[in-house]
Amino acid sequence: MCNCKYREDKLHHECGVLGIYGVDDAAGLAYYGLHALQHRGQQGCGIVTVGPNGEFHRVKGDGLVTEVFNETSMTKLPGKMAIGHVRYSNAGCKGTENLQPFLFHHNSGDFALANNGQIVNYHQLRDELEDKGSLFQSSSDAEVLAHLIKKQGIDKELPRIHSLKNALNMLDGAFAFVVMTGRRIYACRDKYGFHPLAIGKIGEGYVVASETCAFDVIGAEYIRDVEPGEIVTIDHHGIRSQFYAEPERHAMCAMEYVYFARPDSDIEGCNVHNYRKESGKILFQEAPADADIVIGVPDSSLSAAQGYAEASGLPYEMGLIKSKYVGRTFILPTQSLREKGVKMKLSPVRSIVKGKRVVIVDDSIVRGTTSLKIVKMLREAGAAEVHVRIASAPLKYTCYYGVDVHTPEELISNRNSVEQVCKLIEADSLAFLSHEGMLAAGHRSDLCLACFNHKYPTKLYNE
């Protein structure tokens, strides 16, 4: 887990993955696909391709997709197969060595891999592998799979698919892997189904991606999701499926719907915008407010705010405007400058909020500092009352499955009641969506709500 001196008052996802098979200029399509997944990770990115002679090529670096790749670097990535990755560091510290995809050389054939998620028994597996002579090139938990694959192949002389199946069965936690050999791509998802991974068709080839929004930008057609516990093999035969493990449960991360995924993505048959809008409607049913207008915190909360307004009959207004030009890192050297951070990112529309009783809808509250500043900002702009409504339950506990949730002590709802949080953020009222409401918004019978209810689907090896 990376430790930053100054941490934003928002959650971050670990990463996004992409795979392209059987398409001319696979790297070019990977570039646009990764750009569509940029919201899942902004610290670094990379692409690996397999050239016409079976050789592997890689370009990776710190920064956004548009910063790492240019016309010159793209010419270094020939071939009809590619995998790519965008990263926000979680398990493993910052550093170029931790940027994915990883590339490995082995006597049974080179391969590359990239992952979205977090392996909870990483430290135990790494210790065992290092005791047996494995040398790690990074501190990323994703590298464990590569060493397990190699170890299986050496010890048991297994075909690659059997080595992969055995290796995946040794992992516990959340993962959505893309693994590329010289001839095929494997798409693998953990048996709990924590994070999304979808398959699409493009021309005579195929694409896999963390979100379906990547399909739209490259002109691919959605086929289906990779199922929990499934390995999908993509090669000249087309797509083939086998399960390395029986699915445990459909424990899709609730925050994928609430915050991380793009509104135009579909996750397991549910459109993200529709989920958020429905959550806003349910939020009104659970926690109505006597108010004049409804506004949302840009951008991820706008759909929920629309739903709340629709259900309440109140006007939906653009009461907050988000600046497009604030840098993504935004780490300032003094407290006084950091206090101005929210005002640089968000500005109230005075003519809309002045004299109004305002319902402000947000997706979540992490530390509460941003909520406090937004409430103050609206009051300074003339709002008569500010009623805060959150389109998820109180965030109380650490995530071990690929979301950079702060330590429990940093989470304002971990140590305070709803009434206390309301006072701390200086709102006139505060209400959160219930656990039941989060499920109902997507017509789901199950989601991973561990960061809300402390019910973890897996054993926690590091507790």
Spans of model-derived segments:
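Short, glycine/charge-rich flexible loops or terminal/linker lids adjacent to PRPP-binding catalytic cores
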Residues: 313-358, 369, 396-406
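Flexible loop/turn segments at secondary-structure boundaries
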Residues: 25-27, 90-91, 121, 186, ...
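Phosphate/diphosphate-binding loops
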Residues: 166, 213-214, 221-222, 226-230, ...
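PRPP-dependent phosphoribosyltransferase catalytic core
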Residues: 168, 183-184, 201, 219-225, ...
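Secondary-structure transition/capping motifs at alpha-helix termini
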Residues: 134, 155, 286-292, 310-317, ...
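Generic beta-strand/beta-sheet core signal
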Residues: 114, 180, 188-189, 200, ...
